[in-house]
Design a protein with these regions (language model features):
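Histidine-/acidic-rich catalytic cores in large beta-rich domains
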Residues: 30, 34-499
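Intrinsic disorder/low-complexity segments
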Residues: 1-3, 37-38
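Secretory targeting and sorting signals
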Residues: 2-29
Length: 499
């Protein structure tokens, strides 16, 4: 059971759907990921929420697809939140930017000012919870920085690349903070290379995959790994398209999409376009083994092979998790493997399948939660799901359109510096106050005070918080109306005078 951080009502129990362990079969080759840009104002918008107190915010409606409609996370996750980065306006998604929703899909914090967010999540930095996300210019790769926010949603750090790469060259695929106060970053510099092994020009251009470990406090680069020193271009499975391989259109032979710690001495690097997870020695950068691809160090057992994968992570029990974009022919999956380095075999432990076929050509992640459950974000497909460790589907939810590079679950406590927002709509002698507080997680109820002025204002109504925005009927609102946010103990957290 995760720790409770905010009063949230209970909902219906999601039906358990058993996920069968089936074999793997290869599917068609997927294209390189591209983040679309808006192309038409005539795109039909997906369902969005609208608020009287915050008309500028239009987060997507989260809909449960599991049997007991209304539940977006399993009961054990009632007090945790989901972190999403909806994007791709040309698909009709309701907003782009950072989005936190609760276990039922109700908005907690909405930042719709972004042009597209990647890898938005809760992490720990210097012993405190923070929010992190990548911001910059992107297509299938990006140039930008990683933003770090504290619990008041104030920027406390900006992390970027260094060394020969220079600043602002961080790609959007990885933003992990380590326990040592460093961040693991990826970058895609354009480099001259011989592409004759792929049918391209001898004097061509590629996107090299670079991993950096950067000290957040100082910006110092502590470790760097460059793919062309270790992975030949001929290892790619990505076809060279006509016109690719030039400086204007370099060939993405590797497509590095995750970097994670593998004990104190190694890193795991996932490369989509070589179908490989590499274990890399921190000291030398040497590849100690390869999982998958043309030169796999491991033999795969039934159902264990993968392709075009994302988000490879070593778990506390020694297993390796990843998002297999090309699992069975019609569906992607979350994957958990056991690696035996004495026999060099990779064995399927469990796979996490959607309730119906769901092929995510790009993006996606697998997160093992503290209670052992598993969260799967479906990348290009606008869904997220929670499973038991053994593969039983507990909940599945959709935000209808667009995509979210990854999806995460974590407890979060937010205390915004900005005050609540409130609007009074009068109807004759009565009225209704609409109030919200974007990002505040400790509000249990709202109290309305009214009178001729502040000196004689008296309580007129107290109601429980009812989602992101609460509507409060007031029988006889005076010329002065104040709304107070109360925590579970009845303490006033903040107040706002309705204009």
């Amino acid at each position: 059971m995760r720790p409770s951080i905010t009063p949230r009502a209970g909902w219906l129990l999601a039906a358990l759907l058993t996920v069968a362990l089936t074999g793997w079969a290869p599917a068609v080759q997927h294209p390189t990921a591209v983040t679309p840009t808006p192309t038409s104002s005539a795109v039909t918008k997906a369902p969005a929420r609208h608020f009287v107190s915050r008309p500028d915010l239009t987060p997507p409606v989260i809909t449960a697809t599991t049997a007991d409609a209304g539940l977006a996370l399993a009961p054990a996750a009632e007090s945790a939140d989901v972190f999403l980065g909806p994007k791709d306006l040309d698909t009709g998604v309701a907003m782009q930017g950072e989005l936190i929703v609760d276990a039922h899909g109700q908005p907690v914090w909405v930042d719709g000012s972004s042009t597209g967010t990647f890898d938005f999540r809760e992490q720990t930095y210097q012993g405190r919870p923070v929010l992190t996300y990548w911001a910059g210019a992107s297509s299938s790769y990006g140039h930008g920085d990683v933003v770090v926010l504290d619990q008041t949603y104030t920027r406390v750090a900006t992390v970027t690349t260094g060394g020969d790469l220079g600043a602002h060259q961080a790609d959007m695929h990885e933003t992990t903070i380590t326990p040592q106060g460093t961040m693991l970053l990826t970058s895609y510099p354009e480099v001259r290379a011989d592409l004759s092994s792929t049918g391209g020009p001898k004097d061509g251009w590629v996107l090299e995959g670079v991993a950096q470990e950067v000290d957040i406090a100082t910006g110092r680069v502590l470790f760097e790994w460059r793919s062309l020193d270790h992975v030949p271009i001929s290892d790619t499975f990505q076809p060279l398209s006509p016109g690719q391989g030039t400086q204007a259109n370099p060939f993405d032979y590797l497509h590095m999409n995750s970097v994670s710690q593998d004990g104190p001495d190694h890193l795991l690097i996932s490369a989509r376009n070589t179908h490989t997870v590499y274990e890399v020695a921190r000291g030398t950068g040497a590849v100690t083994w390869q999982l998958g691809g043309r030169h796999s160090s491991f033999t795969f057992g039934p159902g264990a092979a993968f392709a075009w994968q994302h988000d490879a992570r070593r778990q506390a029990d020694g297993t390796l998790t990843l998002f297999d974009n090309e699992a069975p022919p019609t569906s992607s999956r979350g994957l958990r493997l056991s690696l035996d380095t004495s026999t060099m075999t990779a064995t399927l432990v469990v796979q996490y399948l959607p309730p119906a076929a769901r092929a995510a050509a790009t993006q996606g992640d697998v997160q093992v939660l503290p209670d052992g459950n598993v969260m799967v974000g479906w990348g290009q497909e606008p869904y997220y799901s929670e499973y038991t460790a053994g593969g039983q589907l507990l909940s599945d939810a959709t935000f209808t359109a667009g995509s979210s590079y990854r999806a995460f679950v974590a407890p979060w406590t937010g205390t915004p510096t900005a005050p609540p927002d409130a609007v009074l709509r009068r109807s004759g002698s009565a009225g209704t106050v609409y109030v919200s507080w974007n990002g505040a997680t400790q509000v249990a109820s709202w109290r309305v005070l009214t009178g001729s002025d502040a000196s004689d204002a008296a309580p007129a109504a107290t109601v429980p918080r009812a989602g992101f925005e609460t509507a409060i009927p007031v029988k006889h609102p005076g010329s002065y109306v104040e709304v107070q946010a109360l925590d579970a103990a009845g303490t006033v957290l903040r107040s706002v005078v309705v204009g």
